[in-house]
Regions:
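Short strand-coil-strand connectors
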Residues: 238-241, 252-254, 271-273, 289-293, ...
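Short, hydrophobic/aromatic-rich segments at coil-to-beta transitions
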Residues: 230-236, 261-267, 285
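Catalytic cores of soluble metabolic enzymes centered on carboxylation/carboxyl-transfer
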Residues: 8-11, 30-257, 339, 369, ...
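Catalytic P-loop NTP-binding/switch module of NTPases
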Residues: 274, 280-318
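Conserved nucleotide-binding/hydrolysis modules and their immediate coupling elements
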Residues: 245-275
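Conserved metal-phosphate-binding beta-hairpin within the catalytic cores
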Residues: 1-26
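Structured functional modules or segments
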Residues: 306-384
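SH3/SH3-like beta-barrel fold
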Residues: 268, 288-289, 352
Length: 384
């Protein structure tokens, strides 16, 4: 069998230590291909077919640096829990239109993308959560790092949460830039999630345009309204009310100017600084991909009946998966912090605990059942 052998190199001594051998390519093989210019897939197939390697070790030269970022269906800012769902919009570096061909690397392009994820595709927890790989190459490590940050800025996945925003924040951090991290760094690092203020402005701006669109207009026109009177400010209900005044060019009093918009990609100058995001506004939820991070704002149905408020006693599934164990029954008395249900997904177990002292009611969870993200498993009725 053909395979790849993995070693760990001690930079201080120059000694190499054997790690493992796999009868396949390593996930990181694009990094090797980027710095050597070799096609490892072609070489491995030739060896598997009985041909000798056409090169020797002396023929291999290393040029520049390369960094690979693995894109996973996980909530990195929420305990790295696996995620599942249907993608709504997927944009990889180099593709901006809804149905653009899969991103690929040109000869002079420092960024390569390997993936099989498209828009309107279902992502399940039944398989490995890796969705793709973004690889950046540069003459120096810093060149490669900057190219990677820019590429992750262009990566937008809506419909489910991924780790792209986390990867972008990590690659942009001072510690990663200065190469002062180690294998234990993430245990104590404070990689900050992007603030939701700018994404909220993007959603509010688009929502106001969609609300005010006329038969002769287009929601993404950038030259203002053509009617005789200025439009009145629009109140957009998101996680909080947001006032959009398109005539004055403000969102909650912050100056906003639309620069460009096409295929859900919107460029705004917010308080004088240019920003770009991918926005998808639907009747009940509005999503934004900004600096790789997905933000979702629920849009309340102000005309419909209010749903039953389950309060903090509703225990919901924080991830899609399988119910491993139900440790309570209807009517049981429970204490704050007591484990009620255990879920499993992607080889991870998560214990769901009671938020307070109370009594179990409306038990919907059953051992072995598959549950969706956000499904209500049971309710804890608080003590009087």
């Amino acid at each position: 069998n053909a395979g790849t052998v993995e070693f760990l190199l001690d930079d201080a001594t120059g000694e190499a230590y054997f790690l493992e051998m796999n009868t396949r390519l390593q996930v990181e093989h694009p990094v090797t291909e980027a710095i050597t210019g070799l096609d490892l897939v072609e070489l491995q197939l030739k060896v598997a077919d009985g041909e000798p390697l056409p090169i020797t070790q002396d023929d291999v030269t290393v040029t520049g640096h390369a960094i690979e970022a693995r894109v996973y269906a996980e909530d990195s800012f929420g305990g790295f829990l696996p995620q599942a769902g249907r993608t709504s919009i997927v944009r990889w570096p180099g593709s901006s239109a809804p149905h653009a061909p899969r991103a690929s690397r040109e000869a002079d392009d420092p960024v390569r993308v390997d993936h099989a994820l498209e828009s309107e595709q279902i992502v399940s927890t039944s398989y490995d959560p890796m969705l793709g790989k973004v690889i950046a190459h540069g003459a120096t490590r810093e060149d490669a790092r900057r190219a990677l940050v820019a590429a992750l800025d262009e990566t937008s996945i809506l419909g489910l949460t991924t780790n792209v925003g986390f990867l972008r924040a990590l690659a942009a951090s001072d510690e990663f830039r200065d190469a002062t991290i180690d294998t234990a760094w993430l245990d104590t690092a404070e990689v900050e999630k992007p603030d939701d203020e700018l994404p909220r402005i993007f959603v509010a701006w688009v929502s106001a345009m969609l609300t005010a669109v006329t038969d002769s207009g287009h929601p993404f026109q950038s030259d203002g309204w053509r009617s005789g009177a200025d439009p009145a400010p629009t109140i957009v209900e998101l996680d909080r009310p947001v006032v959009v005044d398109r005539a004055r060019g403000t969102v909650d009093g912050i100056p906003v100017r639309q620069i460009d918009a096409a295929h859900h990609t919107l460029t705004l100058a917010v308080d004088g600084t240019r920003h770009r995001a991918v926005v998808n506004v639907q009747p009940h939820v509005a999503e934004v991909a900004f600096r790789g991070q997905r933000f979702a704002f629920e849009r309340p149905d102000v005309f419909g009946d209010h749903a039953l408020d389950l309060g903090d006693g509703a225990i919901t599934a924080p991830m899609p998966g399988t119910v491993l164990d139900v440790r309570v029954a209807d009517g049981d008395r429970v204490d704050a912090g007591q484990v009620l249900v255990v879920l499993e997904a992607m080889k991870m177990e998560l214990s769901l605990k009671s938020p307070f002292d109370g009594t179990i009611g409306s038990l919907n969870a059953a051992t072995g059942a598959q549950v969706a993200l956000g499904a209500t498993l049971l309710e804890v009725q608080p003590d009087e």
